[in-house]
Amino acid sequence: MLAGCSFSSSRHQMSTAQRFDILPCGFSKRGSRGDGAAPRVAGDARSGATTCSFRTHPAPPVTQSVSWGAKPEPGGNGNGAHRAVKRAHDEDAVEEYGPIVRAKRTRMGGDGDEVWFHQSIAGTMQATAAGEGEEAEEEKVFLVPSAAAFPHGMAAAGPSLAAAKKEEYSKSPSDSSSSSGTDGGSSAMMPPPQPPEFDARNGVPAPGQAEREALELVRALTACADSLSAGNHEAANYYLARLGEMASPAGPTPMHRVAAYFTEALALRVVRMWPHMFDIGPPRELTDDAFGGGDDDAMALRILNAITPIPRFLHFTLNERLLREFEGHERVHVIDFDIKQGLQWPGLLQSLAARAVPPAHVRITGVGESRQELQETGARLARVAAALGLAFEFHAVVDRLEDVRLWMLHVKRGECVAVNCVLAMHRLLRDDAALTDFLGLARSTGATILLLGEHEGGGLNSGRWEARFARALRYYAAAFDAVDAAGLPEASPARAKAEEMFAREIRNAVAFEGPERFERHESFAGWRRRMEDGGGFKNAGIGEREAMQGRMIARMFGPDKYTVQAHGGGGSGGGEALTLRWLDQPLYTVTAWTPAGDGAGGSTVSASTTASHSQQS
């Protein structure tokens, strides 16, 4: 996490330069400062006595040093948690390559598993109250302004925020916690926070306090987003400070933890919205997710594979569809455009080897940006294939998804080719031309089928930022609840590692815009429109076998929480798509597509495709 840091206007030498502090321990207690000023509500016609919560430098701005290293634990070197996670999951690595087994789990002690939301920004967000739990003392680390320390009583020069909110409530009895933020009106403020309740015996939050804080966190997040939409940096600063006091990646409920990462993303967005006021140099992992994931993403994916059905649902369901496509073919070729650690393919190799007549040759082409990771994945898959007695070949392509060309893929005559895209194609939605080119590349391989596994975004790709923020909060709150349901201990480094993978998605989806925002999740209906209207593909359907596989995996991890929904099909059979849901929230959808108008059926690669490869080679 972030260590102590401050940043100032080093490029813009202005007398109005502001400072944004990031401290490793949250914020000072409300009673410790008496000079905090309540933020001015956007459009407020009251007196200008209210001071700006972004403090002005008393002296000319000076470039300040920044330290982003994580604060080590007392008496340790800070690497213990990483080693503990690695040991725990290296022992279980063989499970990822074997048959599906029932995961051993325990349930959390609390009884508050469901998440309920109330109406909020643009009528799309709902507040949540998560389960009970006692919050231990922990160090809170957030990208939030430490200068925004407000006294508990919220006393300040001029009209206080509490008084303003009281007047607002007296005018409108409805419990509205946000506004559209686009009409120039005031940004909605949440009710004055109440003093936290503590158990006198051990100093931890009293029973029920965690649920109340979870509800307040949702209100603060939506109000902060509303303030950003209204251009009110003073109110946004206040809410970021308030969120920093309550939210924590080690919090007692999933809402505390997901709110911590949304707070960080909102703070990054503040910096990007007012670059003339603030200057920050965060580490590359905060701004470049492709660089910052690395080994952390690899380990997080393995952990997620062990504690949730998400990777297994995507991989095994698509593998069942792929096996049906490869039936009767002697030479098969899978092109995986984001292979990562190759967790999907040992199961496929086992199924192919178990056939009465296994294929004579199996080729997997893996695309990725890390040469070392691709080499390790290829060696691991080669060992699995050798143990199964399969003739196997792995081909690595080191390049970005949008830069791959046909000649790099080594497609050969006589192969039955399948294209696999799991959690990869959504990164192309930032550029329609790039997506069109990629679909053209997929068709040019002569593939008989394109397998697609993606987030069921439901509007996270387009629309107003406020609405996208609300949908993202609902989506990732459900994802954190799903991780929490695995029953890992509250201080588990494995759980933290899995949640940090979602945090990188949150950071990009909330803080960035334009070409820099590549976490653009689309719904199944949106993907169908893109694939069929100009993409050159038609839906190939998901069969009953695939549907049974997906439902079996969901039942393994939580029959009362996870469900699998078929689109365009009835009964227990398949349809056009399958969606994995957590309670009422869709999470991930798998689909299969075949080139439209392929009269020959696409069973073999055309002579022109082979000739193109030969010329380039």
Swiss-Prot record:
- Induction comment: Down-regulated by 24-epibrassinolide.
- The UniProt record lists the GRAS domain at 208-594
Among the entry's GO cellular component annotations, what is one? nucleus
Tell me what PTMs the record reports for this protein: Phosphorylated on serine and threonine residues by GSK2. Dephosphorylated during response to brassinosteroid.
Organs and tissues of expression: Expressed in the shoot apical meristem (SAM) and elongating cells of young seedlings. Expressed in leaf joints, culms, internodes, stems, young panicles, primary roots and lateral roots.
Chain spans, region Leucine repeat II (LRII)? 376-408
Q: What is its main location?
A: nucleus
Q: Which UniProt keywords apply?
A: Brassinosteroid signaling pathway, Nucleus, Transcription, Transcription regulation
Query: Signal peptide position in this chain?
Result: none
One Pfam family of this chain: GRAS
Tell me yes or no: is Ion transport among this UniProt entry's keywords.
no
Ranges where the record places region PFYRE? 417-508
GO molecular function per UniProt: DNA-binding transcription factor activity; sequence-specific DNA binding
The region called VHIID is annotated at 301-366
Low complexity composition-biased segments: 171-187, 603-617
Q: Where is this region: SAW?
A: 511-594
- The short motif VHIID is annotated over 332-336
Q: Does the keyword Transmembrane apply?
A: no
The entry's family comment says: Belongs to the GRAS family.
| Function per UniProt | Probable transcription factor that acts as a positive regulator of brassinosteroid (BR) signaling. Functions downstream of BRI1 and GSK2 to modulate BR responses. Acts as a direct target of GSK2 kinase to mediate BR responses. Involved in feedback inhibition of BR biosynthetic genes. Repressed by BZR1. Cooperatively functions in a transactivating complex with SMOS1 to enhance the transcription of the SMOS1 target PHI-1, and regulate plant organ size. Interaction between SMOS1 and DLT is a crosstalk point for auxin and brassinosteroid signaling.
Query: What quaternary arrangement does the UniProt entry report?
Result: Interacts with GSK2. Interacts with SMOS1 (via C-terminus).
Q: What is this protein called?
A: Protein DWARF AND LOW-TILLERING
